[in-house]
């Protein structure tokens, strides 16, 4: 069976994206790419490569119309929620399955959608069984 282990995201400001995914979401910084035009982050299993992109800004898509989005399971949903608020993140939807409008002042009980610095939709959940067929290692 194949295993997804890598995702690459183009960004307008590589260091800002690094701070978002490392300090706010909780990924670990691995290293810069040899060209210094990219960097790698990891959760220990999956790798996210952040690539500096100098093209004209792309439009931010409304949730549900984006080309791609991805989901992250976190150990402490409330802590991530608080860091996202401190960051000034834009929240998109309450509950990744029901996609209800969100009240950005009320922590959803299970999951939510947020935009990264480049407008990518990121599903955030504290529920380990959020996505069918996903088996996670035991928490340390």
How would you name each of these model-derived features?
Residues 1-15, 68-70, 126-140:
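N-terminal beta-strand motif that seeds the catalytic metal site of vicinal oxygen chelate
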Residues 2, 9-49:
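Core segments of cupin and vicinal oxygen chelate
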Residues 3-12, 40-42, 60-140:
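Vicinal oxygen chelate
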Residues 19-20, 83, 118:
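Structural preference for long, well-ordered alpha-helical segments within the folded cores
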Residues 35, 66, 105-108:
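Exposed loop/turn and edge beta-strand positions of beta-sandwich/beta-sheet ligand-binding modules
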Residues 56-60, 130-133:
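A short local loop/turn or secondary-structure capping micro-motif enriched for an aromatic residue
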């Amino acid at each position: 069976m194949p295993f997804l282990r890598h995702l690459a995201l183009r960004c307008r400001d590589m260091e800002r994206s690094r701070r978002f995914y490392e300090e706010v979401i909780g990924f670990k910084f691995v290293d810069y790419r040899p060209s210094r035009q990219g960097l790698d982050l990891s959760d220990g299993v999956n790798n996210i490569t952040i690539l500096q992109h100098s093209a004209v800004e792309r439009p931010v898509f409304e949730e549900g119309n984006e080309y791609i989005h991805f989901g992250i399971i976190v150990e402490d949903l409330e802590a991530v929620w608080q860091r996202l608020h401190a960051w000034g993140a834009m929240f998109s939807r309450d509950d990744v399955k029901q996609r209800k409008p969100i009240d950005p002042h009320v922590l959803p009980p299970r999951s939510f959608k947020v935009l990264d610095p480049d407008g990518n939709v990121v599903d955030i959940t504290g529920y380990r069984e959020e996505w069918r067929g996903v088996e996670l290692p035991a928490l340390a």
